[in-house]
Amino acid sequence: MSKPVVAIVGRPNVGKSTLFNRLAGGLVAIVENRPGVTRDRLYRDSEWLGRKFTIIDTGGIEFVNENTPITAQMRRQAEIAIEEADVIVFVIDAQISPTPDDDMIAQTLRRSGKPVILAANKVENFAKTELYEFYNLGLGEPVPISAVHGMNIGDLLDEVVSHFPEDIEEEVDPDTIRIAVVGRPNVGKSSLVNTLLGEERVIVSNIPGTTRDAIDSAFEHEGKHYIIIDTAGMRRKGRIEELTEQYSVSRSLRAVDRSDVILMLLDAGEGVTEQDKKIAGYAHEAGKGIVLVVNKWDLIEKDDKTMNRFEKDIREELGFMQYAPTLFISAKTGQRVTKLLDLVDFVAEQNSTRVATATLNTLVREWVHLNPPPTDKGRRLKVLYATQVGVKPPTFVFFVNDHELMHFSYRRYLENQLRSSFGFEGSPIRMIVRQKDEERE
């Protein structure tokens, strides 16, 4: 299920990033009292009343002073966010009258046809603030807020959530594996999807996806069922067409949310880019199974060491994803493409692996005996017991005498031991450390 998207827009210096940080639960966007600090779109997940959603912070939109390249770029970024959004929060400064930029932005938002909530920010005295001037923007009743102090944010979120589309449950066989093919533009996503589908004799159907403008292709292979979520097949609209690279990140994130296994495509000729890192990081945090697929391998001049060098470079650039298997392919020629589905099956199984509690604790005792935790000011960490509490991704709780004694290096040691004993190849592992009450030890 794809999460709704909420875009925060407005002219510069009205408090968009402060509101974004308030909703994201921490300091994510840089907040300074000058225009133009947020130039690119920032994405974070949030939740209200049990509804999860993605929020986007954008740079300020200016129409009056739009002659600089940076101003034009920031405006384009905001236009992309509007295109992506299910709900738009238009932030205005309640301490001054509407400006010409406010009027122009309001016109743009009305034409979008999206639900728009007018958030009147910087309200310090709710009893005395007059907001009647802002009704002229034609966007309904303003919601007075103070993003800095967190005042009335709950009312704003109530209004936001009320506009979310209803959840639509997809009727899909639980044994069906959903595969998201993600990556930058021109990396070969469409070619890979077409090659995979073209090699299969039984293409069951095309299923309209819950993600806007996506077409999911369902097919069978050796009696197993798959759905490919094809981000490359999405339509691009109007002025957004020229901004395919920026827009592709959002499409990829939505596909990640709905998938079981991700095929992360990299261009053999370009290596790992910053955008690749962003998409890979989102996949890692989402707990999805992942395969790193290096495409266009047929175009690379190589010797017997080229593949090893390339894989080493990938591991250095994506250090947080050492667990992901790598496959070098050519979607154009079909080189090694037939191996992909076997690897997808394997990674999906690894991401769903369960470990019996008795087996786990026997091994945990051995690991601690072989490598006892270091002492900290005379105190030593005691790992009392562990249990697995979830899959997709495999999630483990370690009960200890004092969670503050669990150093990140020892946590990494335990994760490495889990992988050595049980595999989990292609799958992230979640580790939760909880402190056991002294009297219950």
From Swiss-Prot:
Among Pfam families, the record links this protein to:
KH_dom-like (PF14714), MMR_HSR1 (PF01926)
Ranges where the KH-like domain occurs: 353-437
Question: Which residues are listed for GTP 1 binding in this entry?
Answer: 10-17, 57-61, 121-124
Q: Where is the EngA-type G domain?
A: 4-168, 177-352
Task: Print the keywords alphabetically.
Answer: GTP-binding, Nucleotide-binding, Repeat, Ribosome biogenesis
A single GO BP: ribosome biogenesis
Which terms in the Gene Ontology molecular function aspect does this entry carry? Answer: ATP hydrolysis activity; GTP binding; ribosome binding
The cross-references to InterPro entries, in alphabetical order and at most eight, read:
AAA+_ATPase, G_ENGA, GTP-bd, GTPase_Der, KH_dom-like, KH_dom-like_a/b, P-loop_NTPase, Small_GTP-bd
Q: Which positions does UniProt annotate for GTP 2 binding?
A: 183-190, 230-234, 295-298
What interactions and quaternary structure are annotated? Associates with the 50S ribosomal subunit.
Q: Which NCBIfam families match?
A: GTPase_EngA (TIGR03594), small_GTP (TIGR00231)
**What HAMAP family does its record include?**
GTPase_Der (MF_00195)
Q: What does this protein do?
A: GTPase that plays an essential role in the late steps of ribosome biogenesis.
Family named by the database record: Belongs to the TRAFAC class TrmE-Era-EngA-EngB-Septin-like GTPase superfamily. EngA (Der) GTPase family.
Name of the protein = GTPase Der
Q: Which gene encodes it?
A: der
